[in-house]
Amino acid sequence: MPRAIEPNPAYKRAMVVVAHADDAEYGCSGSVAKLVREGIEVVYVLCTDGSKGSDDPQDTQESLSAVRKQEQIEAGKVLGLTTVEFLGFPDSELEPTLALRKAIAREIRRHKPDILICQNPTRSLEIAGYVGHPDHQAAGEAALSAVYPTARDRLTYPDLLEEGFGPHKVREVWVMLGPERGDFFNELEEEDMKKAVAALKSHESQVQYPEVDARMREWRGRTGARVGFKFAEAFKVFTLG
């Protein structure tokens, strides 16, 4: 039974872990805008360096990575993020390795989020003409494994303790999903939609179609229609013990 996400006044911080610059803007930027509006501090963690997603023969890996990093910083300003962390793993080569899990766990311990939002760790075959990106799956799997048990358990990676990063228990995990698979729906206000669209437009190297606003509203509108909302984003939500 689909349910609405209700704000929890005890929550103060949230973290979004994604593979690439623009992934969060496509998947959960309305919810990020809403969280910030509700007084939640939000941090992004970008797993890859964003160095591969271009057909422009003038681009190099180094130049593209620098552009995409700046675009993500600008999108973060639109949404009101506290900070954006860049882990710098090679784009299009991301795997759910122990190194990636540890790097994400370090950021969880550093920022101590109550909510962690991540990508679907399974291949999505819901969208016509799209078979899913392996980096997205890797980022989702590593994020979930970092939440439990790596960030939680004090004796996992003692060197993180030496760095000053003690264990932390995330209280909720929101996995980004399409409207057909989500079981929790976050209702978005017009203010949230405007910021989500503006944030996505910050990614000029990747978002090169003119109807960004219309598409975003159509996507969020279709999601919201499942539960009687004008706009919404869908998640699988886990409350952790």
Show which residues each predicted segment covers.
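Active-site rim/loop-helix segments in enzyme catalytic domains that contact anionic ligands
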Residues: 1-112, 236
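Metal-dependent de-N-acetylase/amidase catalytic core
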Residues: 1-15, 98-241
